[in-house]
Structure formats: structure tokens, C-alpha cells
Amino acid sequence: MKPSIYSLTRQEMIEWAEAQGEKKFRAAQIWEWLYRKRVQSFEEMTNLSKDLIAKLNDQFVVNPLKQRIVQESADGTVKYLFELPDGMLIETVLMRQHYGLSVCVTTQVGCNIGCTFCASGLIKKQRDLNNGEIVAQIMLVQKYFDERGQDERVSHIVVMGIGEPFDNYDNVLKFVRTVNDDKGLAIGARHITVSTSGLAHKIRDFANEGVQVNLAVSLHAPNNDLRTSIMRINRSFPIEKLFAAIEYYIETTNRRVTFEYIMLNEVNDGVEQAKELAELLKNIKKLSYVNLIPYNPVSEHDQYSRSPKERVMAFYDTLKKNGVNCVVRQEHGTDIDAACGQLRSNTMKRDREKALVENVQP
């Protein structure tokens, strides 16, 4: 199976071209065709020799993904189900924000973190996505708009789709550097957010990388007992270890950390828990920000329900009174398979049911 050319960084592209006996500027031409002109085949690279195009075709594909399903919401959200070369499925989501087009990318097939409220973890991790498969998600979303003649450009990226990004650390870092490259898509580092469920040692590594992207931490609870009950990862990285890493990140980068907090009715959404959260954040208030997330119910996790608006606002008001910067996240795509992993999970379920029916037919 040939790799995607998107898996190469610009420096790797230069090294590849030189290994083929080509001049360095040929790599720059290929890079421009891919990321500025956004072609989908090597034959469209009209200033390259036939010999070089043949070498590219022999060693690479352009986009390794196949679009299976597209769901469009009334609010402009678009959810994509993509098929990987090995037949596995992933999700990507485009969200229209007041500041531009934001794409949420997937980094793994399945997830091993085991959050008890999440559709992504219903299917265990099967493999990591490589850098090219992550980049390809952005390129296919952009192609979706290019083909419609819509003069819109992906401006923001959130690495918050299926999987734990820091469990696929090297590929995610390579992806960030590829989409941030000023000769390519040139998506600003401060327009890119990488999320983690709390791999403390990787947060420390990330602090030392020198990348200027944003960090978000899926917290979802203000104490160890509650967090362990809804997020299995807290057994390995309890809040004390997690916050030591977060404080190291802030001291090293002087960058703000966003805390994601999903609102589960009568589980983690009480005023006392808001006070606990404010106390937990007291030493990093100036460089922290809490994102309160309305819960999208998942049929497989029917023990949870969405917090009523009055409970959300009481939680929000308590944080504000205690000096915590926070916001209630705007919802997107509530009229489609909105929860992370839900479209993929529902599609796989339908595919299994279809296969069973076909197998029993005479």
C-alpha cells in the first residue's frame, strides 16, 4: 500500500526530490501544487516532467481517504465519514464559527482512554493514523468547498476528534508542523488547538517542543474520585500529577490552557463541584480558561443526560464569581450525529446489520 504524499514534511519532500536526482526547487513546486493549488492527482502538476510524475505515481498516492458519508446541519456544520485505505472508518467535522471555518480532526481509529460518556471509546483503538491521513482530512474538507466554488478557507484546526492525540504524539506533532508551514496551508499556530485527556508526561514533552499552538485538557471533574469514575485515565494520571504537568507547561510556554468540562446532569454539574473546580484552578487562573460543554446524549451511555440550562448557568456563575474565565460552548450539528464518534459508530452498526441480513438470505 503506497503512502500518501501528505505524509512528507517540506524538508522530507526536499530530501525525496534530491534522492530522485531532482533539484531542490522541484520539491517546492510539488509542495505548492499540493497545498496552494490543492490538486488531487500528480498529472495536474503541469510544470513537472513526465519522468518525475511517474516517480510520484510509483511511490505515492495523493489523498488516501475515501468519502463515505457527508451530513450537513442546518447551522452549517458538516460531518464527514471517511474510509481509510484498510477499510477502517474515521470522522471529521467542519464547524462554522464567527471567526472562520474550524475543522476537528481524528488521530486514531478508535480510542483506549475509556471515558464513560463518549461515543469514540465504544470501539477500542485499532491503530494510529499517520501524519498523511490526518493532513488528508483537512485537504478533503477544503476540497469540499473548492468544488462548490465557495471562496472559503479552513482557518482553524482542533485536534479533538476520535482518539487521544498524545497517544499518537509523533504523527500529531508532524501534522501540526505540516499544516502550519508558511509555504503550504499556513494555518497559524494560534489557530490550532491540540487536546489531551491528560497524558501528563506528554504535556511536559509538548511544552518543550517550541510550537505555539494551543493546548486543551479534557478535565470533566474537579476531584480524583469523580474523575476516575468517568475517565479511566485518571487512575494513571491523577489530578495531582496532571496539574503538575500543566503548571510546568504554563511556566515553560507562558501560554493559556483551556479546560474542557462536559456537563453531565447531577454527575459533575453541581455548584459545589464548580467551587471545587475554582479552587483547583486558583494558582493558574490568569492562564486558564474553562469551556463548559453541553452533553450530546449517546444511546450506549444512557446513564448520562444533558444538564438543564439552569444547572449549567449556576455552574457558570459560580466559576465567574470565583474569578475563573469560562464560557458555555456554542453547540454545532445538533440535528445530525453530533457526538464525537457517533456517526462512525452508527454507520458501523448499520454495516454489521446489513451483513447479517445478507448472510442469512438464501
Swiss-Prot record:
This is Probable dual-specificity RNA methyltransferase RlmN. It catalyses: adenosine(2503) in 23S rRNA + 2 reduced [2Fe-2S]-[ferredoxin] + 2 S-adenosyl-L-methionine = 2-methyladenosine(2503) in 23S rRNA + 5'-deoxyadenosine + L-methionine + 2 oxidized [2Fe-2S]-[ferredoxin] + S-adenosyl-L-homocysteine; adenosine(37) in tRNA + 2 reduced [2Fe-2S]-[ferredoxin] + 2 S-adenosyl-L-methionine = 2-methyladenosine(37) in tRNA + 5'-deoxyadenosine + L-methionine + 2 oxidized [2Fe-2S]-[ferredoxin] + S-adenosyl-L-homocysteine. Its main location: cytoplasm. InterPro entries: Aldolase_TIM, Methyltransferase_A, RlmN_N, RNA_MTrfase_RlmN, rRNA_lsu_MTrfase_RlmN/Cfr, rSAM. Reaction proceeds by a ping-pong mechanism involving intermediate methylation of a conserved cysteine residue. [4Fe-4S] cluster binds at C111, C115, C118. Its EC number is 2.1.1.192. Specifically methylates position 2 of adenine 2503 in 23S rRNA and position 2 of adenine 37 in tRNAs. It comes from Streptococcus sanguinis (strain SK36).
